[in-house]
Amino acid sequence: MLDKGYIEQILNSKNEVLESIGLKVKSGVYNRNKQKKYDEIVGFCEHLFKVIFNEVGKKRFVFLECSCGKSYLSFVINSILSSFSENLIPYFYGIDKNRNVIEKCVKIKSVLGYSNMEFIEGNTINYTPPRHVDAVLALHACDTATDEAIAKGIEIGAKFIIVVPCCQNQIRPQLKSGHPLTALTDFGLLRYR
């Protein structure tokens, strides 16, 4: 089982990956500005591997990361899984509306020599992956993007849908005084997540 300590141990040996995606600086030191992101990714991976680890080695496991942004998550998962066996080659689709981040992901993929990753500019809800997807992922996808990831996972029949929502900018303004859910937003962290 991959616990947090083991995941971090693997990542400590992956300087090239972590530097390429900006979680470490060239000296091998963790980027303090990205420490929170690193911790979120490690935590997400710990939960992800608890759920999928026994399934991953059975066949070519396909991931779809929705609203992938800079795709830290897919790059980290790819590097962790590739450390177990040369025969264990997952496949990743990353989709995001932002052309700039998709272009950066394509460059990083090329630098790292990852031929098992594709990055697509577009909307999650309109995208149909060319292969069957085993796991749909979303980490801090904003507004309705988490909902779209869940809907896409159901639509394409993914066995696993693992998401961590972000801020709900469209819902928060609707929780006005007198709304039955207003009490949920008394605590700032809940109000903005």
Listing of model-derived features with the role each one plays in the protein:
Residues 1-36, 42-46, 62-66, 86, ...:
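Class I S-adenosyl-L-methionine
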Residues 45-53, 78:
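Generic structural signal for well-ordered alpha-helical scaffold segments
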Residues 52-62:
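Short helix-loop-beta connector
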Residues 70-87:
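Conserved SAM-binding loop of SAM-dependent methyltransferases across substrates and taxa
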Residues 91-96:
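Conserved SAM-binding motif I beta-strand of class I
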